[in-house]
Amino acid sequence: MYTHKAADAVSWYQPHADSSLALIRQTGITADAAVIDVGGGASTLVDDLLAARHSDLTVLDISAAALDVARHRLGDAASAVHWLEADITQVEFPEHRFTLWHDRAVFHFLTDAADRARYLKAVGRAVKPGGFVIVGTFAEDGPEQCSGLPVRRYSADTLHDEFGAQFELLGKAEENHHTPFGTVQKFLYCYCRKLG
């Protein structure tokens, strides 16, 4: 995608991930807490987390080109981030590696139950007990496709049900995302804590 379009010309572009940042602040995590941004690619969330002095950041994306956009934008500051080109359904993290798992717009692309199960296994393994998971997907009245691909739309209850009893739902947020093309995409964010 990023080899054909500028980072600010894709439907999911945001100058700042304000909804995500507000939820991250609500967690009260410290600046040295381990944070992963799943599907972070060219997102500016990492810029804002670095500006807030977060020091243990991982950005995972399946697209090397998207990661390169962010690295180039950050310049020397990119060396403070762990960049991981991987498919989230295929990667295995060390146990309890992260205090915060953030995903805006990856989980809704997992239309296959087996892919969702692998994703959820990765979350369950990688997030510390007491850690937080913030996941943003298209809402029930959001788009049925993104970039020509089908997606699953969620309510807070159906999204939390995917994650199961090991995660306590702390809250939800809705976002009307205005795309660069002048359309509105309705997002739902769930904010959970891992029990145990």
Regions found by a protein language model. Give the residues of each.
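Short catalytic micro-motifs in class I SAM-dependent methyltransferases
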Residues: 105-109
